[in-house]
């Protein structure tokens, strides 16, 4: 499912996340408190269609863990290794959910790192490599 076009241009990660997550939140039957902590100027050169598909998969997994509602937080920052994106929720812990996204993540050159959140729920962190590193993976 594609939410954005122009796959190769650098784009705002905040705008991409907002465009992908908003429809999923509207479809969810229970109330979800969504917090987006991604600077508007933070960009990525990752393939937007593939990244959108990966975010959709991760957010759907999070929402499935919160049938009665909860909190979903997406945080992004720039690191020495690339752009880091974390999706955290107040659903069940890591051991209670499917964490297999190797093909979707490998397509954009990242490996998801899963961890339990101290307040409950789980988080997955993606490091989107800089464009040179992404080209080597492809």
Regions found by a protein language model. Give the residues of each.
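Glycine-rich/acidic phosphate-handling loop/turn and adjacent ATP-lid/helix
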Residues: 82-103
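Conserved micro-motifs of the catalytic ATP-binding
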Residues: 2-6, 43-46
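A residue-level detector for a conserved hydrophobic packing site
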Residues: 51-52
């Amino acid at each position: 499912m594609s939410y954005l076009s122009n796959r190769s241009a650098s784009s705002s990660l905040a705008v991409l996340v907002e465009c992908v997550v908003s429809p999923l939140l509207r479809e969810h039957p229970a109330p979800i408190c969504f917090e987006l902590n991604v600077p508007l100027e933070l960009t990525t050169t990752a393939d937007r269609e593939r990244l959108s598909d990966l975010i959709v998969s991760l957010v759907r997994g999070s929402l499935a863990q919160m049938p009665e509602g909860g909190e979903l937080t997406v945080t992004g920052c720039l690191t020495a290794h690339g752009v880091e994106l974390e999706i955290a929720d107040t659903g069940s812990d890591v051991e209670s959910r499917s964490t297999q996204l190797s093909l979707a993540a490998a397509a954009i050159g990242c490996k998801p790192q899963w961890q339990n959140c101290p307040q409950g729920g789980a988080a997955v962190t993606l490091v989107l490599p800089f464009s040179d590193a992404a080209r080597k993976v492809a």
